[in-house]
């Protein structure tokens, strides 16, 4: 039987495909590469915790007030400390001198201490803004006056960002996260001032009060301390008026004149803050030295001159040099050496200077 050529061709193609399939090498199945052992993640050693700070209200007067030394330890990197103060009256001159001394002592350790004056008033707007600026400029620590309660949230925010904050000279009674305070017991100073006034005027008579700022909590503590003590212990002392002089001597001069004109029988003027020499000058110019007594604070040159003349009966100190010096040193010691102040409120000495003992505290220039 004759085969069709197409069938023969199809058979040949089929046989050829079968031969190729049989001869093809089998493709090995893919094999998975064994997984490499997991490498442990790099872990950064946690920062050691700082020691606990003393209780906010625990008070003491340290033996090394004004002379505290830096710990002899080199920090890991250069550091910056901001000290926020004022220069609106002569009181601040020795405060700044204290800060400059601290800067000199800390310089060998690679620490820069900057004295910064953000304005001429103690307000939260001024000093809160200055604290925010110091945080933005990456200061390692901040020391500030805090006489306005509104400053507290700014301090707490800085501490929350890892920057310790200390206060000096004046602070709010509102609890906050500041590390420590260096300055006077202001309410007690007001009480002491009342006792000095009572001694000067024989425990009775009309007295006027010139405060720095009613809005500054520190000045209010001195004012209320005076008023409360006089009411309690010397009820025959009558406060005839209270004004604020914004820490200015020339304003105190005019206010003292006004008080003496309105009250011819005035026997005392109590100045809680800056500018007492202005009130004393008004008393002297009115010819009433020894009849109208001034009681004040601080040992600035002009004030001491009027103590020496017998116009200011007593002026009460607060160690301004220590207030400017100690915060920067103690902040450094805390950051670098974990040295914690012994108290939360490091109360400065409150020496009382009168004409009788002025030679122990002042030499005329």
Predicted segments, located by residue:
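Bacterial lipoprotein signal-peptidase II cleavage site
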Residues: 20-32
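Hinge/cleft segment of the Venus flytrap/periplasmic-binding protein
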Residues: 44-77, 218, 229, 233, ...
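Extracytoplasmic "Venus flytrap"
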Residues: 56-75, 79-98, 102, 106, ...
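Hydrophobic alpha-helical segments within soluble ligand-binding/sensing domains
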Residues: 60-69, 181-207, 221, 252-253, ...
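Structural motif
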Residues: 64-68, 111-137, 241-262, 276-279
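Short, solvent-exposed amphipathic alpha-helices that sit
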Residues: 91-107, 189-193, 217-237, 251, ...
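Hydrophobic alpha-helical
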Residues: 144-160, 226, 244-304
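Flexible loop/hinge segments that line or gate small-molecule binding clefts
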Residues: 149-188, 206, 300-308, 312-313, ...
């Amino acid at each position: 039987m004759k085969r069709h050529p197409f069938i023969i061709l199809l058979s040949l193609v089929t046989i050829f495909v079968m031969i190729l399939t049989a001869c093809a090498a089998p493709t090995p199945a893919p094999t998975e590469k064994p997984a490499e052992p997991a490498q442990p993640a790099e872990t950064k050693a946690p920062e050691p915790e700082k020691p606990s700070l003393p209780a906010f209200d625990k008070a003491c007067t340290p033996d090394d007030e004004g002379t505290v030394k830096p710990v002899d330890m080199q920090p890991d990197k250069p550091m910056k400390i901001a000290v926020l103060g004022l220069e609106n009256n002569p009181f601040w001159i020795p405060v700044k001198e204290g800060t400059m001394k601290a800067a000199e002592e800390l310089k060998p350790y690679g620490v820069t201490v900057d004295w910064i004056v953000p304005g001429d008033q103690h307000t939260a707007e001024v000093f809160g803004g200055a604290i925010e600026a110091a945080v933005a400029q990456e200061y390692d620590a901040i020391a500030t006056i805090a006489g306005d309660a509104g400053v507290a949230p700014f301090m707490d925010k800085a501490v929350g960002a890892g920057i310790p904050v200390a206060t000096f000279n004046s602070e709010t009674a509102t609890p906050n996260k500041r590390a420590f305070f260096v300055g006077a017991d202001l309410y007690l100073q007001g009480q002491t001032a009342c006792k000095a006034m009572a001694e000067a005027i024989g425990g009775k008579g009309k007295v006027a009060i010139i405060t720095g700022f009613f809005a500054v909590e520190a000045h209010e503590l001195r004012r209320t301390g005076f008023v409360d003590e006089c009411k309690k212990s010397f009820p025959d002392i009558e406060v005839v008026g209270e004004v604020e002089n914004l820490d200015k001597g020339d304003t105190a001069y005019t206010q003292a004149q006004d008080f003496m004109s309105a009250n011819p029988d005035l026997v005392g003027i109590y100045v809680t803050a800056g500018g007492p020499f202005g009130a004393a000058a008004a008393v002297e110019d009115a010819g009433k030295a020894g009849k109208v007594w001034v009681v004040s604070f601080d040992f600035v040159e002009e004030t001491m001159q009027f103590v020496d003349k017998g116009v200011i009966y007593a002026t009460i100190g607060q160690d301004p040099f220590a207030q400017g010096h100690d915060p920067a040193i103690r902040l450094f010691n805390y950051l670098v050496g974990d040295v914690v102040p012994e108290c939360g409120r490091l109360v400065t000495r409150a020496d009382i200077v009168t004409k009788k003992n002025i030679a122990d505290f002042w030499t005329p220039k």
